[in-house]
């Protein structure tokens, strides 16, 4: 396994270069562009279904662009952790100083298992510096009205999902279930809770093969704040 300190010296920067939105009649795809110079580039993808009869153009939608940018801010930590560069350059969008500190807080407090597993002693002040180098997103803001009812319930196949579905059973007709990369356990949970296919929103997330290869080679690995991935991606799905 590579040394945390040595990796940070050898790879001082992580760059969030941008993202591309690929749109068709029935779905929206997102391809992110991350890089650790001198080590690897990463292009994870997401695929979201469009609502039936959807007429909006998401490529030109400023609100949607901000949601996509923010999901990229969550996604990047899975790739940053391979070498933990001390500087993160954000070229894909603009962040205020307060927002940079918010993201640092999310990252640091979501990496506890990662630090423990790898025997790393670190503090929130020094583990990362976020530099905002990009401009504001393009496109007019298109916020949604507040008239929508019901809940979008994330389902991971575990006890938390089953308990949530049970607690909200009385409002089942208004609710939908949300699954990232559907599999047997998640689909069974939804089915046994009495939700139909028309109440199921499924999205596809693909990890970049370069990260998986670095993990195989002994670069740093461990848990990242997955609940944040669920939260930010489900916001896009609901939008």
Regions found by a protein language model. Name each.
Residues 151-153, 163:
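An acidic-aromatic substrate-binding cleft motif
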Residues 160:
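Hydrophobic/small residue at the entry helix of a nucleotide-binding pocket
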Residues 1-150, 167-207, 216-220, 239:
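RNA-binding accessory domains that recognize and position tRNA/RNA substrates
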Residues 213-239:
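Conserved adenosine/adenylate-binding substructure
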Residues 155-157:
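Class I SAM-dependent methyltransferase "Motif I" SAM/SAH-binding loop
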Residues 163-167, 230-233:
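Short, hydrophobic/aromatic alpha-helical segments in well-folded domains
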